[in-house]
Amino acid sequence: MANYTAADIKTLREKSGAGMLDVKKALDEADGDAEKALEIIRVKGLKGVAKREGRSASEGLVAVKVTDAHDVAGQVGTMVELNAETDFVAKNATFVGLAERVLDAAVASAARDADALLAADAGGETVAEIVDGAAATLGEKLVLRRVARLDGEHVGVYLHRTSKDLPPQVGVMVATDAAAASVAEEIAMHVAAYSPAYLTREDVPEQLVADERRIAEETARNEGKPEQALTKIVEGRLNGFFKDQVLVDQAFARDPKKTVGQVVAETGGTLTGFARFRVGA
């Protein structure tokens, strides 16, 4: 019988994310050598990659890093979302470590989409290869879902845990000029809570605005509103849409009497961009 202890089983489970029975079988096969056992788990896991492709990976984490810009004055924010099948794996040290490596590769490569990041170098392997390797070790489908890169004179970030036992599930980056840097983090917290879709009204697609206007008018007519009041009613409802979807028009979470745009204007600065990820959304 292979020579290993309960502590060895516990350590290997934490490293691999594999079940107790699989860990014991691997240790037996490796004659108690933990490193060989980990390799056995990984090899067996690779054989199951194809079987896992059809599974859903809706758990995971969001990771963010802000670095100084090299070519211009200011900062660069980089954010990634990495998905797994279960929250058990999402909080596993191997998975969290993988996310850190993926994030570092995203920063180094300046990738702006998942395909570019998957092809990027991650210490001698591509990001795709280290994700597949971790999937084999952990025995779950892992997916690099998306990456965002945001440039600004200042980039404020906020990470939110939906459960204290899990890594961050919501991540936000907010870019401002230097004058508005003092409110960037508070606005990032606001974005996490209120999930705006657009920065300004000008960013809303014209067709979407036209559709909202048409729906508002049809609804008002169906409600029997007087013809002479339709224009005012439609504009009011369209403004309601903007207040719900546009960041600078939203009531500020910390002081609802002001809009986010007003809070930024009071600093004399400008809000230049934002990105928000929520795991699985």
From Swiss-Prot:
Annotated region described as Involved in Mg(2+) ion dislocation from EF-Tu, given as residue ranges: 86-89
PANTHER family: ELONGATION FACTOR TS, ELONGATION FACTOR TS, MITOCHONDRIAL
Protein name (database record): Elongation factor Ts
Major localisation: cytoplasm
Subcellular location per the Swiss-Prot or TrEMBL entry: Cytoplasm
UniProt KW Endoplasmic reticulum keyword: no
Gene this protein is translated from: tsf
GO molecular function: translation elongation factor activity
Stored HAMAP family: EF_Ts
Function: Associates with the EF-Tu.GDP complex and induces the exchange of GDP to GTP. It remains bound to the aminoacyl-tRNA.EF-Tu.GTP complex up to the GTP hydrolysis stage on the ribosome.
Keywords from the named record: Cytoplasm, Elongation factor, Protein biosynthesis
Gene source species: Beutenbergia cavernae (strain ATCC BAA-8 / DSM 12333 / CCUG 43141 / JCM 11478 / NBRC 16432 / NCIMB 13614 / HKI 0122)
GO-annotated cellular components: cytoplasm
Record family assignment: Belongs to the EF-Ts family.
InterPro entries, sorted: EF-Ts_dimer_sf (IPR036402), Transl_elong_EFTs/EF1B (IPR001816), Transl_elong_EFTs/EF1B_dimer (IPR014039), Transl_elong_Ts_CS (IPR018101), UBA-like_sf (IPR009060)
